[in-house]
Amino acid sequence: MHSFSTLPNHRIGLYILWTIPVLFVIFKLLAPAKCSLPIVNGRRWFEIGQYQARRRFSLDGRGIILKGLQKARAFRVVSQKGPKIILGPEYANEVKSHPACNADVFIAKEFHAHVSGFEVLRPQHVMKDAIRLKLTRSIGALMRPISDETTLILETQWGNSNCWHELDLKSTIAALVSRVSAVMFVGEELGRDQKWLSIVTNYSSDMFVADLDLCKWPEILRPIATYFLSSCGKLRRHIQEAALMLDPILSEGNSTHGNKQNFLDWFEEIAGGRKYNPVLAQISLAAAAIDTTSDLIIQTLTDICRFPDSEKLQEELREEMVRVLRADGWEKSAMYNLKLLDSVLKETQRVKPVVVFGMGRYVTEQITLHDGTVIPKGETINVVNTRVWDSAVYENPLEWDPYRFLRRRDSGDHAAHLVSPTPDHMGFGLGKHSCPGRFFAATKIKILLCHILLKYDVKISDEASSKVVSSGNFLFPDATLRISVRRRQENLSIWD
């Protein structure tokens, strides 16, 4: 038997010629099926790589998506994070319950949950169960503590002056939301600690930067690249610092003070022996609670102040708040009966949602959708939330109408409630993976806005910019906006 090195050159050449097509066939058989959907913002003929296509998406993601929907109902885009499949809203009900469309795997892959610093994004089933089984059922008991904490924060940060004074809207609302949330999640001592608040607040914003930095690297190199990127190093430091602060409380074996319970207790109870990381769970919980809640409050206050008849709207909201709170107090029924406020919030979430597309799913097996559209195994898909701007669904869709959902609710439309997601309004997602904490979030937002509007007059300068900032898939309120406030003389009996 000849060794390969002793074979004649012509026979070596024949082996190579036969090997290449065999390997090609093997690779073709093992490789994922190629997606045939059109790509709407690919690289131009003179461009090398996808850098410019990604940059264009970063600058005008919403515009690219809307143009894509004019050409096809299912297509691909080159996003800041690479190629994605985008589906029209008519696929929402199909995707939400399809067994081959996995939300947990999508989140893990989309946000590098296997990479150091991003462990917070790993599926947190204990957290989801605690929200569903404990938090949602405890909303009534938490309303008074939320109100009391809001009072303390506003007195310190907004003051009691009856003269107009300006506040940075983004930072003051983020501080309010983060502290109220933290006190409910980890108790008063840690929840009021500025270092803890800084950690849980900054992790989310720093993760956004680190995520985009990491996406510039090939996926196979990201577990290594994370150790060379300063933005990823920040995430690891946040986690380490959070552990140093939380571990002493956890080591006591009892986080409960008096008869008050918080998520530290609920996690242990719900875990029931299941393995979980309480530090990662707390950071994940805070990130979910702070960003979207702050976003909605900031944009709602902006919309109220920008409304042509702002003073009249503010008085109508205050009249409703006083009437309802006098009748119901801080009970769950009060939140249900704040119908105008609910309409205002849902309308703000409609006109400026947090994202253009959501419902991210990883396709575990090739699927064929109702119209014959084939999605290969291994692809990630997203469903657009663009019906919120569709004139076939909403009259004058680009106009902010604070009474829109109040009219719909009065006509018997049960989907007009803030916490009721539909394919026409997916602000909280859709289906079994819709935001599990939306009931708590809606309650917290309403309580905070009751305090703000009843205790303060608010306005925004006519000269101030309040444009929505688009960055890829995300829509952000204007981060530079300042709000003017002054203390009002409200009926204090409603806070008793």
UniProtKB/Swiss-Prot annotation:
Entry GO terms, CC: membrane
InterPro entries for this protein: Cyt_P450, Cyt_P450_CS, Cyt_P450_E_grp-IV, Cyt_P450_sf
Main enzyme class: oxidoreductase
Highest taxon listed in the record's lineage: Eukaryota
Pfam family, one: p450
One of the protein's GO biological processes: mycotoxin biosynthetic process
Transmembrane segments annotated in the record for this chain: 12-32
Note: In A.calidoustus, the austinoid gene cluster lies on a contiguous DNA region, while clusters from E.nidulans and P.brasilianum are split in their respective genomes. Genetic rearrangements provoked variability among the clusters and E.nidulans produces the least number of austionoid derivatives with the end products austinol and dehydroaustinol, while P.brasilianum can produce until acetoxydehydroaustin, and A.calidoustus produces the highest number of identified derivatives.
Similarity comment text for this entry: Belongs to the cytochrome P450 family.
Protein name: Cytochrome P450 monooxygenase ausR
